């Protein structure tokens, strides 16, 4: 098994965490991106840098030579994901990204499922805090249930200082849906113009009850129903964190002191099952999620091939427990 893992967008905020995590896990990060100056800055720390652009397939092919896997950390994923998946398929290597964009993740399943399966490779979109972690928690909470009526994923963030990449990706998604909102109900994605409700969510102690925005839809509405029979998938965001999205963007920074709790409830008939994860810094925790995914793919610890969400391709409880250095878990 090769140890070289290409990271596209390596010099971005999440990308830097991914590079550090790869190195911590004994992998050799190959730094990919189109900004030569920023690549050179990271390469000065002893990494190999390869300039590549999603507009130039040849540059991507050259950049992936010798790589065992590709992690895409560069948004907007509506722009970067497809060219990079194409390059990964040509190179015959697995692809993992940290996309939170709902439409970009849906595109992965719609456009690449058959080709990735035919190639015998694995494409894992949304392998990050939004989309990946929630899917793993829902899958773990389901346990031996083969179906459920509803899955609820509530995000309790102490704050949310968005990166520039988060804001740009959000703008791209907003334009794609023409400013409308999206939810997963009745077994399908539905676009609407309804006002978002505010309600109280009973997060576990020590967080306790908090005001949340209902139907604050995240990538879980793509990942969860991609493999689980759950016709209603609803996500919620703490009202304070939602208001922070309008705050000025910080520059490059280290690990944030902001904390999070992800509270998952799965309901079937009159029964409810719950799984909870708590931790610190939603961007930093995306790195061990993505790198653990790559490690499991490269070591053959997968359950399927093709385009698959975290909960579909990995043993969800085992995966979550492997991140005990980064997450505190309940009900897993």
Predicted features along the sequence, with ranges:
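N-terminal Rossmann NAD(P)H-binding glycine-rich loop of SDR-like oxidoreductase domains
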Residues: 5-25
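Structural motif
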Residues: 4, 68-69, 94, 273
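Conserved Rossmann-fold cofactor-binding substructure of NAD(P)-dependent oxidoreductases
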Residues: 51-67, 73-79
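Glycine-/Pro-rich loop/turn segments that contact NAD(P) or position catalytic residues
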Residues: 77-180
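Conserved beta-strand positions in the Rossmann-like core of class I SAM-dependent methyltransferases
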Residues: 30-31, 96
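Active-site-lining helix/loop region of Rossmann-like oxidoreductase modules
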Residues: 8, 143-274, 284
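N-terminal Rossmann-fold cofactor-binding loop
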Residues: 32-36, 53-54
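C-terminal active-site/capping subdomain that shapes the small-molecule cofactor and substrate pocket
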Residues: 241-332
């Amino acid at each position: 098994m090769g140890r070289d893992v290409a990271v596209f967008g390596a010099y971005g905020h999440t990308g830097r965490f991914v590079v550090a995590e790869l190195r911590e896990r004994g992998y050799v990060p190959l730094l990919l991106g189109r900004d030569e100056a920023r690549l050179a800055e990271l390469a000065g720390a002893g990494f190999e840098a390869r300039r590549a652009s999603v507009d130039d397939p040849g540059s991507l092919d050259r950049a992936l030579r010798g790589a065992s896997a590709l992690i895409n950390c560069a948004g907007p994923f509506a722009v970067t994901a497809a060219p990079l998946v194409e390059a990964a398929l040509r190179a015959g290597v697995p692809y993992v990204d940290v996309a939170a964009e709902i439409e970009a993740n849906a595109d992965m399943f719609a456009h690449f499922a058959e080709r990735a399966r035919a190639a015998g490779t694995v494409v894992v979109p949304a392998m990050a805090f939004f989309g990946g972690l929630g899917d793993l928690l829902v899958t773990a909470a389901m346990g031996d249930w083969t179906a459920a009526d509803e899955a609820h994923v509530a995000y309790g963030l102490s704050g949310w200082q968005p990166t520039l990449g988060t804001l740009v990706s959000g703008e791209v998604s907003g334009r794609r849906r023409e400013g409308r909102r999206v939810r997963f109900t009745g077994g399908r994605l539905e676009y609407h113009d309804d006002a978002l409700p505010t309600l109280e969510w009973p997060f576990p102690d020590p967080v306790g009850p908090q005001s949340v925005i209902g139907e604050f839809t995240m990538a879980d509405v793509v990942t969860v129903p991609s493999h689980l029979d759950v016709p209603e998938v609803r996500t919620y965001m703490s009202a304070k964190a939602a208001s922070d999205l309008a705050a000025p963007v910080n520059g490059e920074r280290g690990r944030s002191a902001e904390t999070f709790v992800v509270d998952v409830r799965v309901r079937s008939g009159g029964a409810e099952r719950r799984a909870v994860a708590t931790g610190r810094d939603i961007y930093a925790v995306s790195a061990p999620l993505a790198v653990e995914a790559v490690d499991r793919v490269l070591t053959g610890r997968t359950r399927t091939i093709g385009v698959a969400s975290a909960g579909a391709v990995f043993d969800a409880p085992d995966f979550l427990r492997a991140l005990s250095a980064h997450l505190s878990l309940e009900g897993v």
